[in-house]
Amino acid sequence: MNPSGAGLSLCIAFSSIFAGVAPVEYHDTILRVRYAETDRMDFVYYSRYFEYFEVGRAEYMRARGAVYSDLESEGIKLAVVEATARYKAPAKYDDEIRIRTRISRVTKTRVFFEYEITPSDSDRVLVEGSTEHACIHDNGRPRRIPEKVIKALGVTEKKEI
C-alpha cells in the first residue's frame, strides 16, 4: 500500500454548505511506529495517537487538494476544539500501522473527523478516535467554512449520521 495515499481515487462531490453529511469513505495513511513514540512498556505512548490523527487528517485533506498550509495562507484555520481516543490494543515499536480517516459531519462552521488505527495488514482496531474542528479567522473569531473547502473535502449533501 502506498503510504502517501497517492493514487487513491475518491469522488469529490460538489455541494454548498449544509447541516450535515453522510460519512465519506476512509482515506488510509500507512506509517511505521518509531522508537521515540513508545513508552517503557514498548507500547505507543497514548498521546502519540493524537499526532497520528493529525497525520491522517492532513493526508486526507492533501489527497483532496485542501492542503493545510495553503488554507492557512488564505486565512482559513481549522482549530481543534475537541479530541477523543478509545484505546483497544497497543501498537508497538516498528509496527506498520494504518490511520483510517474520514469526515463524519460538517456544519456551517465545524468539521468532524473520525479515525481508526489498525495494523496495516489487518482490520483489527487498535485505537478509534474523533476530532472536532472550528473554522476560524486569523483573529480567532469563528467563520463559515468556505464553499471551496467543503467541495474539496468531498462530502455529500445528506443528513448527519
Where are the regions a protein language model picked out?
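Intrinsic, low-complexity polybasic segments
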Residues: 6-7
